């Protein structure tokens, strides 16, 4: 069907979001058209602000308004332990359980040769540099329990072991093929407590 150009552009824009197909994008576009102008302006401003006002922490790679982020700045954190996660949503999930007191390192992805993503395409080089400069005794690999997550964890483990840092993996209990961000707090808490050495 042919839509007016502004609607077509909006549908195309919504389809750039993960999980949004043509039908959902169309519904969102027409819902936006029905919204009050003030609400649309506020929505558009929120989209622009998230890109302009947020950055990535130069230490851990987590999203932040200030660099370094509040977690890296917190002197009460256990600086001898770093939990490596795939994305920012994983940090938020871990923080919700309020049990982990160490630092983080956000990779912004996982190794996926099928998608053309190698170790140099995610935040692994900065992790290795960080481990050389900081006094870290344990690295917790909290990748998602899927093929890409397992590959990434094994790759990092092989890189880090020669440095002499203990490398652990979250205990299973997380469903294979699932995403860390969707795990409940009890499951995450048990996974941290039961982590195993690699």
From Swiss-Prot:
Toprim domain mapped to chain residues: 80-175
Cross-referenced Pfam families: RecR_C, RecR_HhH, RecR_ZnF, Toprim_4
Keywords: DNA damage, DNA recombination, DNA repair, Metal-binding, Zinc, Zinc-finger
Gene Ontology molecular functions: DNA binding; zinc ion binding
InterPro entries reported in the protein's UniProt record: DNA_Rcmb_RecR (IPR000093), Hlx-hairpin-Hlx_DNA-bd_motif (IPR003583), Rcmb_RecR (IPR023627), Rcmb_RecR_Znf (IPR015967), TOPRIM_dom (IPR006171), TOPRIM_RecR (IPR034137)
The keyword Protease appears for this protein: no
One GO BP annotation of this record: recombinational repair
Keyword Hydrolase listed: no
Residue spans, zinc finger C4-type: 57-72
UniProt-listed PANTHER family: RECOMBINATION PROTEIN RECR (PTHR30446:SF0)
Recorded family membership: Belongs to the RecR family.
Function: May play a role in DNA repair. It seems to be involved in an RecBC-independent recombinational process of DNA repair. It may act with RecF and RecO.
Protein name, UniProt field: Recombination protein RecR
Organism for this UniProt entry: Staphylococcus aureus (strain NCTC 8325 / PS 47)
